[in-house]
């Protein structure tokens, strides 16, 4: 399966934190994805871009914080995270290129 431009619109960037590093030991990778994407789109995009088989996709939406800048109230953007569990024997190394 080749990666189309639409697949790159779904996956924004990989998230590398202490929690995601621990999840990667269990075969899961965490990505920030487009807020309007759904689980089948995320699964298709990861399989096309990275050439792996996806077992499951779990998503969360984190609401943006209210912040103050020069006395004005503003809101940060909402962020959608996708926890992608890979099939046995498949790996994605997101730390390359850092």
From Swiss-Prot:
SUPFAM superfamilies, per database record: Ribosomal proteins S24e, L23 and L15e
InterPro entries: Nucleotide-bd_a/b_plait_sf, Ribosomal_uL23-like, Ribosomal_uL23/eL15/eS24_sf
Span of the signal peptide: none
Gene Ontology terms: cellular component: ribonucleoprotein complex; ribosome
Pfam families: Ribosomal_L23
Keywords: Ribonucleoprotein, Ribosomal protein, RNA-binding, rRNA-binding
Origin superkingdom: Bacteria
Gene Ontology BP annotations: translation
An example molecular function term from Gene Ontology annotations: structural constituent of ribosome
Function as written in the Swiss-Prot or TrEMBL entry: One of the early assembly proteins it binds 23S rRNA. One of the proteins that surrounds the polypeptide exit tunnel on the outside of the ribosome. Forms the main docking site for trigger factor binding to the ribosome.
Similarity remark: Belongs to the universal ribosomal protein uL23 family.
Alphabetized HAMAP family for the sequence: Ribosomal_uL23_B
Assembly and binders: Part of the 50S ribosomal subunit. Contacts protein L29, and trigger factor when it is bound to the ribosome.
Cited NCBIfam families: PRK05738.1-3, PRK05738.1-5, PRK05738.2-4
Name of the protein in question: Large ribosomal subunit protein uL23
């Amino acid at each position: 399966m080749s990666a189309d431009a639409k697949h790159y619109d779904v996956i924004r960037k990989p998230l590398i934190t202490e929690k995601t590093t621990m999840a990667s030991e269990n075969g899961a990778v965490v990505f920030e994805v487009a807020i309007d994407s759904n689980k089948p789109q995320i699964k298709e995009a990861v399989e096309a871009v990275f050439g792996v088989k996806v077992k499951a996709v779990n998503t969360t939406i984190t609401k943006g914080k209210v912040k103050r800048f020069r006395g004005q109230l503003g809101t940060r953007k909402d962020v959608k995270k996708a926890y992608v569990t890979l099939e046995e024997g498949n790996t994605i190394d997101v730390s390359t290129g850092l």
